[in-house]
Amino acid sequence: FPVQERPYYCLGLEKRLIDGKIICEHSGGLHGVSTKGGLVEGGYSCAVLCNEGDVDVNEFQWICYNFILGLPLETTHRWAEPNGRTFSMPEALQGDFMAKEGVPSHCIVRWENGMLTGTYCDRQVDFLYCGKTVFAIVDKADHTNRINTAEFYLKDGRAWGVRCYTRIYQRADL
C-alpha cells in the first residue's frame, strides 16, 4: 500500500503520513461504542474508546498523535476541506448506501434545492464538496460540526459505493 499524506484504504485500515511519520488507523464498528486506534511509526500506539455509538473521536485521537509527534495539540489532520464549489454530477451520487458491520448503517444522499443533503448514521447532514469525488459530511443545522469525510466511487456514471473513513457503504438501492 502506498505511503502518502492522503489516507489510503487498506482493507479496513487507513494508512497515511502525518508530519513525515507513517500512521495506520482503524475505527470500530460495534453498536453502542466508538473507537479509534492508531499505530505510529517509531513504536507508539494509541486508542480512543467511547461508550457511545457514532461519536466522532478523531479530534481526541489527533491530540494523541500530536503529543507523540511533538506537534501543537490543536493541529488538525483532516485531509479534505470544502472548496465552496458544486460537484458537477450530483445525480450520480444520489441513493441509499449501506454498511453491514454489526448493525447496518446507512448513508443516504439526495440532491435538493441545489445541494447534496441526506442522512448519515441517522443524522441529518449536508455534503460539502472538497474536490474530485470527496465531500465533507457536516451537520445539517451546523456546518461547523464536521461529522466525517466521504469519498464516492463511481462506475459508468453512477456511485456504487462511498467510503467514510474505514467503512465502505455499498449502494443498496440497485
Show where each model-derived region lies.
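Catalytic loop of the DD-peptidase/beta-lactamase superfamily, centered on the K-T-G motif
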Residues: F1-L174
